[in-house]
Amino acid sequence: MKISVAAIPFFLLITIALGTKTESSSRGPYHPSECCFTYTTYKIPRQRIMDYYETNSQCSKPGIVFITKRGHSVCTNPSDKWVQDYIKDMKEN
């Protein structure tokens, strides 16, 4: 069986990614992947946001993760006024 030289890095990357996911999920309910290490630098249009959640208190930085209608997760700074306004609006509705 011949394998393309270009396919080898692809399969290696997939193997590493799957191994990393398995390793983090075996540690219990807390996953560092649920933490925000950087915040978005732009304001997300409110109509694109479907839901949000707060990051775990064990994370090194606090964060609010907004889930967009397309299913993307965006880390935001909970002290930004627009983030607080969006949360307030979502709680009221």
UniProtKB/Swiss-Prot annotation:
Offer an example of a GO molecular function term for this protein. chemokine activity
What does the entry report about post-translational modification of this chain? The N-terminal processed forms HCC-1(3-74), HCC-1(4-74) and HCC-1(9-74) are produced in small amounts by proteolytic cleavage after secretion in blood.
Q: Which UniProt keywords apply?
A: Cytokine, Disulfide bond, Glycoprotein, Secreted, Signal
Gene Ontology, cellular component aspect: extracellular space
From the Swiss-Prot or TrEMBL record, state where the protein is found: Secreted
Q: Tell me, which GO biological process terms does this entry list?
A: antimicrobial humoral immune response mediated by antimicrobial peptide; cell chemotaxis; chemokine-mediated signaling pathway; inflammatory response; intracellular calcium ion homeostasis; positive regulation of cell migration; positive regulation of cell population proliferation
> What family does the Swiss-Prot or TrEMBL record give for this protein?
Belongs to the intercrine beta (chemokine CC) family.
* Protein's recorded name: C-C motif chemokine 14
On whether Transmembrane is a keyword of this UniProt record, the answer is no
Q: Tell me which positions the record assigns to the signal sequence.
A: 1-19
Q: List the disulfide bonds.
A: 35-59, 36-75
The UniProt entry, under InterPro entries, shows: Chemokine_b/g/d, Chemokine_CC_CS, Chemokine_IL8-like_dom, Interleukin_8-like_sf
Lineage of this protein's species? Eukaryota, Metazoa, Chordata, Craniata, Vertebrata
- Expression across tissues: Expressed constitutively in several normal tissues: spleen, liver, skeletal and heart muscle, gut, and bone marrow, present at high concentrations (1-80 nM) in plasma.
What is the name of the gene encoding this protein? Answer: CCL14
Primary subcellular site in the record, as a coarse category: secreted
